[in-house]
Amino acid sequence: MNRIFGRGKPKGPPPNLTDCISGVDSRAESVDKKIARLDAELMKYKDQMKKMRDGPSKNMVKQKAMRVLKQKRMYEGQRDQLMQQSFNMEQANYTIQTLKDTKTTVEAMKIGAKEMKKAYKNVKIDQIEDLQDQLEDMMEDANEVQEALSRSYGTPEIDEDDLEAELDALGDELLLDDDNSYLDEASSAPAIPEGAPGDRTTNRDGVLVDEFGLPQIPAT
């Protein structure tokens, strides 16, 4: 049968919006180039008419410029249509891509919810509470062991009378520490001799004193 009727042409991949957008944009660029060439031609006719006087020759150039302008307006309309088509397809393509992303997100969330359910099935609150109770009991036992190990032996009993006596004794010691009279006595002691033996000096009262600051007895 294939020999008689021949084989059908293999079907190509279906068109997608991205390829369509590229094709439309390429056509719009081609139209822009044509418009640019027509603009250059209009400028040429403009320069010619500036140099010409009114008459049949100038009117002929003006008619050519009118035909070029009509072509330009036609191409501009085509370009605007192509640009609008491209914009519409881009919006549609964006919407489709957004929907695909949303679908992927929803599927991922569903998979995550299933995994969470499976994980929670293996978690039992009663077992966790029992484990917490066991840990609390073990901590209490450990504290009791520490208290037993830190117990002191042979410590004398202390009553309130012993405490008051100790505090009174501490107060007396503090008073003794605050008594600085011995410092005054030390400061009033004779100073170290400064002069050489035999030097004659006087104190503040004008009395002769020796090198130790002691009054000298006059020789008789």
Curated annotation (Swiss-Prot):
Keyword flag Protein transport: yes
Protein's membrane topology: Peripheral membrane protein
Stretches for region Disordered: 1-27, 178-206
Ranges annotated as biased composition (Basic residues): 1-10
Keyword Protein transport appears in the UniProt entry: yes
Annotated GO biological process: late endosome to vacuole transport via multivesicular body sorting pathway; protein transport; vesicle budding from membrane
Gene3D superfamilies for the chain: 6.10.250.1710, ESAT-6-like (1.10.287.1060)
Keywords: Coiled coil, Cytoplasm, Endosome, Membrane, Protein transport, Transport
Primary location recorded for the protein, binned into one broad class: cytoplasm
InterPro entries: Snf7_fam (IPR005024)
Protein task: Probable peripherally associated component of the endosomal sorting required for transport complex III (ESCRT-III) which is involved in multivesicular bodies (MVBs) formation and sorting of endosomal cargo proteins into MVBs. MVBs contain intraluminal vesicles (ILVs) that are generated by invagination and scission from the limiting membrane of the endosome and mostly are delivered to lysosomes enabling degradation of membrane proteins, such as stimulated growth factor receptors, lysosomal enzymes and lipids.
Assembly mode: Probable peripherally associated component of the endosomal sorting required for transport complex III (ESCRT-III).
Family classification: Belongs to the SNF7 family.
Name of the protein described by the UniProt record: Charged multivesicular body protein 5
